[in-house]
């Protein structure tokens, strides 16, 4: 058989064209009446037009050209990202550069204020001769300013003004400036130890602490538990604190109940810090006057038993006083063997606490010094409203004054309802008929009703301008209905039916399931309605632990004492 060549096959009707893209096989579709079109299996591009096929249009970019174009775009994108990252890093460095603990500026080890020799009345002042001598021997870090020396001897010298500051006295720095000194914490890896005063739990809680510290881990420390009444079960207190903290949606590593005075619970905090710091600096943070400096002194004393570095740090420890705003700048303390730093920070000054509205001379009256003993008032302890209205019928129509700072009008209550006040002893409580309450307040303000006290304080006093109506629901007559907490002062426990020896609370009818009161305080002091704090021996009897699911048990922080 003769060998067939390409010429022996019939001629194609039209020349066939292959696509210009490679490398897959080409499928040829034959039809005697139509053109032969070549289509690549791997590409879904539309067929090439006749003009392009015959060379009358611009050639499509080759794969190599497309690759180079993509590479150039990728490189340009990398440059832009690098510039953005560089800008962010620059801003972060600027924020951290504002960190007040500057080694080039020596600060008073008592309050953190920069040392200066020009203004005698300002924080940080030291004698020029002493300053030059200490500077010559490189001992400026061992200096304490004149203000701290006066504070250590009991003088009340405020230095903070502005929103959240304190009226009266000299105001050298604003509360906003002190908050700005803590702004770097959001951009820095640190371990935060947040302090809350148990006597002013709601007022000192710092619910928006994440705005200051970002995502840094937090250890929650409750201070001044030695002020709680005798017989208080710390198991109940710890569970109550954890429950309230979870309701406020604040995630913490653990909760610790402490007393800087008796050192109770401080060793547990020291162990937790050593466990969780992991090379990070440790910052003690909290509202003004919650006891940060006192807690640091107790912490150093506890750590010094095993750590020689902490023992050496005790020589120059922060000053502690009853004046809110004692600390005016972060104080660096070399307290750890690993080289991490411990910082005492300026208190966060809150405008909604009583300390922000009273005169600086009256600030000591707001701080409880001894264990709290509640002052209880029921119908048997109140005066009669008139000779025609015998005592013992109802609490309705009476008004309580808590010093000159709080007024409580009872609008609806049960005859057996009891109000128990927990706060500083310096503020006396007076009960009068509501119809004479306004006249009584105007007459006795500054005399029986203090603070405010003194002529100057009276002139600056703006009165009780904020009023809040509270409707308290009674779910169980055998336990207190609720606490009314006054920010920066204390709280009032409301017991629907006071329990007496040998008697049981009676059953309530449908009309007796609410208590209505009106609380008046100075602007902008806040009033909180919260679950009753289980204090004293009676708290152990009525407090109920909530049953937890497995998931709740897993995420719930542990508490220690």
Curated annotation (Swiss-Prot):
Keyword Mitochondrion annotated: yes
InterPro entries: G_CP_dom, GTP-bd, NOA1, NOA1/YqeH-like_C, P-loop_NTPase
Molecular function as annotated in GO: GTP binding; GTPase activity; oxidoreductase activity
The enzyme's E.C. designation: 1.14.13.39
GO biological process, one term: plastid organization
Any single Gene Ontology cellular-component annotation: chloroplast
A Pfam match: YqeH-like_C
Compartments where located: Mitochondrion; Plastid, Chloroplast
Induction of synthesis: Constitutively expressed. Induced by abscisic acid (ABA) and lipopolysaccharides.
Tissues of expression: Expressed in aleurone layer and the embryo.
Domain of life: Eukaryota
Transit peptide interval: 1-31
Keyword Lipid biosynthesis included in the entry's annotation: no
Annotated ranges, domain CP-type G: 175-351
CDD domains: YqeH (cd01855)
Disruption phenotype: Pale seedlings with a delayed development and greening of true leaves resulting in small plants with a characteristic virescent phenotype of pale young leaves but green mature leaves. Loss of NOS activity in mitochondria. Reduced extracellular calmodulin- (ExtCaM-) triggered and salicylic acid (SA)-mediated increase in NO levels and subsequent H(2)O(2)-dependent stomatal closure. Faster dark-induced senescence in leaves. Higher accumulation of hydrogen peroxide, superoxide anion, oxidized lipid, and oxidized protein.
Residues the entry annotates as binding GTP: 108-111, 166-174, 223-226, 260-261, 289-294
Top-level enzyme category: oxidoreductase
Control of this protein's activity: Stimulated by calcium/calmodulin. Inhibited by L-NAME. Not activated by tetrahydrobiopterin (BH4), FAD, FMN, or heme.
Biological role: Exhibits cGTPase activity; binds and hydrolyzes specifically GTP. May participate in ribosome assembly and stability and thus regulates protein synthesis in chloroplasts. The GTPase activity requires MgCl(2)and the presence of either KCl or (NH(4))(2)SO(4). Involved in the post-transcriptional regulation of the methylerythritol phosphate (MEP) pathway. Involved in chlorophyll-a fluorescence regulation. May mediate the production or accumulation of nitric oxide (NO) which is a messenger molecule involved in hormonal signaling and defense responses in plant. Acts as an antisenescence agent. Plays a crucial role in both extracellular calmodulin (ExtCaM)-triggered and salicylic acid (SA)-mediated H(2)O(2)-dependent stomatal closure.
Family: Belongs to the TRAFAC class YlqF/YawG GTPase family. NOA1 subfamily.
Name this protein carries in UniProt: NO-associated protein 1, chloroplastic/mitochondrial
Organism (species): Arabidopsis thaliana
Gene: NOA1
């Amino acid at each position: 058989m003769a060998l067939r060549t390409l010429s022996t096959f019939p001629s194609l009707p039209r020349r066939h064209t292959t696509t210009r893209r490679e490398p897959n096989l080409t499928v040829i579709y034959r039809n005697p009446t139509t053109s032969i079109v070549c289509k690549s299996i791997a590409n879904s591009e539309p067929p090439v037009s006749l003009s392009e096929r015959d060379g009358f249009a611009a050639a499509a970019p080759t794969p190599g050209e497309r690759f180079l174009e993509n590479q150039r775009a990728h490189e340009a994108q990398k440059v832009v990202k690098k510039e953005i990252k560089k800008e962010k890093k620059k801003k972060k460095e600027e924020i951290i550069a504002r960190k007040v603990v500057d080694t080039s500026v020596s600060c008073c080890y008592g309050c953190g204020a920069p040392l200066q020799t020009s203004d005698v009345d300002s924080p940080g002042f030291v004698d020029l001769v002493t300053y030059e001598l200490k500077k010559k021997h490189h001992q400026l870090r061992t200096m304490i300013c004149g203000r701290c020396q006066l504070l250590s001897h009991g003088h009340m010298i405020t230095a903070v003004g502005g929103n959240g500051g304190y009226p009266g006295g000299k105001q050298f720095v604003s509360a906003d400036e002190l908050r700005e000194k803590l702004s770097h914490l959001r951009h820095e890896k640190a371990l935060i130890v947040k302090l809350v005063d148990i006597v002013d739990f709601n007022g000192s809680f710092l619910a928006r602490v994440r705005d200051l510290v970002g995502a840094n881990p937090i250890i929650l420390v409750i201070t001044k538990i030695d002020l709680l009444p005798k017989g208080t079960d710390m198991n109940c207190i710890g569970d109550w604190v954890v429950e309230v903290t979870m309701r406020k949606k604040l995630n913490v590593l653990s909760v610790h109940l402490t007393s800087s005075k008796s050192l109770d619970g401080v060793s547990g905090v020291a162990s937790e810090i050593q466990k969780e710091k992991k090379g990070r600096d440790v910052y003690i943070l909290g509202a003004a006057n919650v006891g940060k400096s006192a807690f640091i002194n107790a912490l150093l004393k506890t750590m010094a038993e095993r750590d020689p570095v902490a023992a050496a740090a005790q020589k120059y420890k922060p000053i502690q006083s009853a004046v809110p705003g004692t600390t005016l700048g972060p104080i660096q303390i070399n307290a750890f063997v690993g080289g991490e730093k411990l910082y005492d920070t300026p208190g966060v000054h809150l405008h909604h606490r009583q300390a922000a509205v009273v005169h600086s001379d009256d600030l000591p009256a707001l701080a409880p010094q001894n264990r709290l003993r509640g002052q209880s008032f029921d119908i048997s302890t109140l005066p009669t409203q008139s000779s025609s209205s015998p005592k013992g019928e109802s609490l309705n129509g009476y008004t309580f004054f808590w010093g000159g700072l709080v007024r409580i009008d009872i609008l609806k209550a049960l005859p057996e309802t009891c109000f128990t006040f927990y706060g500083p002893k310096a503020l006396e409580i007076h009960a009068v008929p509501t119809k004479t309450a306004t006249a009584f307040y105007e007459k006795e303000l500054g005399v029986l009703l203090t603070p405010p006290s003194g002529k100057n304080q009276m002139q600056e006093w703006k009165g009780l301008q904020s009023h809040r109506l509270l409707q308290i629901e009674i779910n169980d007559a055998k336990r207190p209905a609720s606490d009314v907490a006054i920010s920066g002062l204390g709280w009032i426990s409301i017991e629907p039916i006071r329990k007496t020896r040998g008697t049981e609370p009676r059953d309530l009818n449908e009309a007796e399931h609410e208590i209505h009161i009106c609380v008046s305080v100075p602007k902008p002091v806040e009033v909180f309605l919260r679950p009753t704090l289980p204090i004293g021996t009676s708290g152990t009897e009525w407090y109920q632990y909530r049953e937890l699911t497995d998931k709740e048990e897993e995420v719930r922080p542990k508490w220690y004492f």
